[in-house]
Amino acid sequence: MRRAIELAARGLGSTSPNPVVGCVITDASGAVVGEGWHQRTGGPHAEVHALRAAGAAAHGGTAYVTLEPCNHTGRTGPCAQALAGAGITRVVYAVSDPNPQASGGGATLRAAGIDIAAGLLADEAEAGNAAWLTSVRLGRPHVTWKYAATLDGRSAAADGSSRWITSAESRADVHRLRAESDAVLVGGGTLRADDPHLAVRGVEGATQPLRIALDTRAALRPTARILDDAAPTLLVVGEDADTRHLPGVELLRLPLHDGRVGVHDLLTPLFRRGIRSVLLEGGPTLAGAFLEAGAVDRVIGYLAPALLGAGPAALADAGIENISDAQRLDITEAVRIGPDLRITAVPVPVTTSTATKEH
């Protein structure tokens, strides 16, 4: 199953709005005879690739799949039937399919006399498919907040300069994150301060994400780098914003509340558009708004071995006033990226947080 999870990760960035899935087939003796993963939207599913690789050796064998085999006919046929037709006698899957349109594959296989086991390495498989699972369960895109900071938590120096806090290795890793995401989002402050480009560079075969600029007053300059043709761009503005200086730019007009776009008011139309994962690269204010709205599902921080002592923090007001209200995180990974440290963490649900509140 761990190998199947590794295979599934190869589909990140190319299968959305569908899940990433990996499959390993063993023969009757337990030897691996076929592997596969879902490679692109509309293409054969992982089980089909693995069955093709296994051929006749799949008969009497076991299929290890990261997600419950689908039970519906879309652009491809149901994988549950493909497994049964190949003579597979046992199916082990990590995560049950929460999509009502495709779930039920386990029951179909069981009805066909196939032995079923679920839940093997479920946590690892869930983490690898977090974007799709979050979107199905919550009806909104999965959001990763990415930031870069010094060890004392500064995202820029006192004079506003921030290029470059982290190393070239960390910046290359960010391009990998972009390539795995459906969309990259920044706010007006970042647009004005950095004139970011946000397209993927240096990742072979990458699908360019949708670049989203949240600029309520449409103050974006027509010469902004985000408006070039390297990747698609969506400009999110207030309902009454004057955009006559930006002809040809795709717009999403949303109502403002106290001068701001509501986080969920933004995520809902993005989900309807087919966006399942958003990489939030905005500054501290936008990050704070998403955190306050409960819309940060993963945090990836690149920490540089440097100290500034002054300058803006990586996170601004998130509606937290007391230490007992702090958003606790579960660190899932800490690795060296060049001279920097990359920390990946997920929010701890309030109900299970170690923080205590006085009543």
Task: Label each residue range with its predicted role.
Residues 20-30, 147-148, 343:
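Short beta-strand scaffold segments in enzyme catalytic cores
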Residues 293-329:
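Flexible, gly/pro- and Lys/Arg-enriched active-site loops
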Residues 24-124, 210, 289-291:
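Zn2+-dependent cytidine deaminase-like catalytic core
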Residues 131-138, 142-277, 285-288:
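Active-site ligand-binding patch in enzyme domains
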Residues 1-16, 132-135:
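Short, basic/aromatic recognition patches
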Residues 318-359:
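Conserved histidine-centered catalytic loops in small-molecule metabolism enzymes
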Residues 4, 22, 70, 109, ...:
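Residue-level signal for inorganic ion chemistry
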Residues 98-101, 123-124, 192, 219-221, ...:
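Short gly/pro/ser/thr-enriched loop/turn and capping motifs at secondary-structure boundaries
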